[in-house]
């Protein structure tokens, strides 16, 4: 139905349309009244958030939560903090500084955030956060408390009174042995200089003896247990270490040292004139005066096959004992009356080895109560040639030579005889 209304005029009989009030044009000077649009109800929309916690520079396994949006614009950091406080306790989120992962140019970066900052999604509605552990302001102002709370603690900081006297630690020098090919011992066993000199000397001797082939254990005489104890003040500024000379390396198959070379070296050491006990302390001689197994073996086989021509000056002029390379040990000069006393002196200076009644060697190398059976016999021509070179010898010389060849036991009868002569 049309809204127009026709009316008749008296002048002319035709109809004129009439406009309604709704369609009347308003004047342009009149302002329109703005009415506020209706607010849509806010729906509790949740978005997924993945966050990492960084402790000591390492990222933990990722955590997943759902955060409710408080604004239509998107996610804010305060929404995440409120959610973490509800789930993991109040103050948990304040222990970390938060940053969000976002795209930047052709890659991704961590965008540091404050509490009121907007969080940009990575892709679509994907949010990734990282929480880095922060230090408290009181810990930063007090560095001592920072050291106590850190995971790497100094044990001396826990007891400052105990460690105030010895602030300077003992110096420990370590030496790497590069000449051993079979066994690679990276470090020697070392001891601090704060120990007493007696204890450190015993430990060094024990450690050195375990690294040699001398495994035998013998009961030490009472005289050898008495040692001079030096003042510990002379060892204050010295570091105790085992050098390469003090430890004999383990034997190897490729070692050029043969049995003959070892015996010659022992011959040079043993056949010297009588000196002080400190002069004989070498690699083959222990500090207590006893000898190594190689030196004892040299004494057993020295009266026959091995030659000592290359051992240097071996003539003992003071005692009257001379060694011949082929014939063994013979007494060349000396009075016949005190022959036994001279032999005793020679045996005491010959290596200074004193055998006891209960003393034994590893492997039962020698038994003092049994006679040694010669393994090899010389031919008659060799014996004749040797006799022609040596010249005539008396029976006394032969008896004394045989007596000097063997290693006697403890000279008890001689001592008793001397005591009887003095009384």
From Swiss-Prot:
Residues 196-211 have a biased composition (Polar residues). The keyword Cell division applies. Changing residue 303 to A: Delocalization from cell membranes. It is a peripheral membrane protein. Residues 19-33 have a biased composition (Basic and acidic residues). Expressed during embryogenesis and in roots. Residues 406-415 have a biased composition (Basic residues). GO terms for molecular function: protein homodimerization activity. Pfam families: SOK. Residues 45-136 are annotated as: DIX-like oligomerization domain. Residues 1-33, 150-172, 196-258, 379-423 are annotated as: Disordered. SOSEKI proteins (SOK1-5) locally interpret global polarity cues and can influence cell division orientation to coordinate cell polarization relative to body axes. The DIX-like oligomerization domain is required for polymerization, edge localization and biological activity. 'Soseki' means cornerstone in Japanese. Belongs to the SOSEKI family. This is Protein SOSEKI 5. The gene is SOK5.
């Amino acid at each position: 139905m049309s809204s127009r209304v026709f009316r008749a005029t008296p002048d002319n009989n035709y109809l004129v349309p009439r406009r309604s009030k709704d369609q009347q044009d308003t004047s342009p000077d009149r302002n329109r009244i703005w009415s506020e649009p209706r607010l849509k109800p806010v729906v509790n929309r949740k978005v997924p958030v993945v966050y990492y916690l960084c402790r000591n520079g390492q990222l933990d396994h990722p955590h997943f939560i759902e955060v409710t949006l408080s604004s239509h614009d998107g996610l804010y950091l305060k929404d995440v903090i409120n959610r973490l406080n509800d789930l993991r306790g109040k103050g948990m989120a304040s222990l970390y500084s938060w940053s969000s992962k976002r795209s930047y140019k052709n890659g991704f970066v961590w965008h540091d955030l404050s509490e009121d900052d907007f969080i940009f999604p990575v892709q679509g509605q994907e949010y990734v956060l990282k929480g880095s552990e922060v230090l408290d302001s009181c810990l930063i102002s007090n560095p001592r408390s920072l050291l106590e709370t850190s995971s790497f603690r100094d044990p001396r900081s826990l007891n400052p009174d105990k460690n105030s006297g010895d602030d300077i630690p003992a110096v420990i020098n370590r030496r790497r042995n590069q000449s051993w090919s079979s066994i690679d011992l990276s470090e020697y066993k070392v001891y601090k200089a704060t120990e007493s000199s007696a204890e450190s000397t015993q430990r060094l001797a024990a450690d050195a003896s375990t690294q040699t082939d001398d495994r035998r254990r013998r009961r030490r005489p009472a005289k050898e247990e008495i040692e001079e104890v030096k003042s510990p003040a002379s060892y204050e500024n010295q570091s105790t270490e085992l050098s390469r000379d003090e430890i004999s390396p383990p034997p190897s198959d490729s070692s050029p040292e043969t049995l003959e070379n070892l015996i010659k070296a022992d011959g040079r050491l043993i056949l010297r004139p009588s000196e002080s006990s400190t002069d004989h302390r070498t690699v083959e001689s222990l500090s207590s005066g006893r000898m190594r197994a190689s030196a004892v073996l040299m004494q057993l086989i020295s009266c026959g096959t091995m030659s000592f021509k290359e051992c240097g000056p071996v003539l003992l002029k003071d005692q009257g004992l001379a060694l011949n390379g082929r014939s063994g040990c013979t007494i060349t000069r000396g009075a016949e009356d005190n022959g036994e006393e001279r032999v005793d002196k020679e045996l005491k200076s010959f290596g200074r080895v004193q055998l006891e009644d209960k003393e034994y060697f590893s492997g039962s190398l020698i038994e003092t109560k049994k006679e040694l059976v010669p393994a090899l016999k010389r031919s008659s021509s060799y014996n004749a040639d040797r006799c022609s070179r040596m010249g005539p010898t008396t029976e006394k010389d032969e008896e004394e030579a045989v007596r000097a060849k063997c290693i006697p036991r403890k000279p008890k009868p001689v001592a008793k005889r001397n005591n009887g002569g003095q009384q």
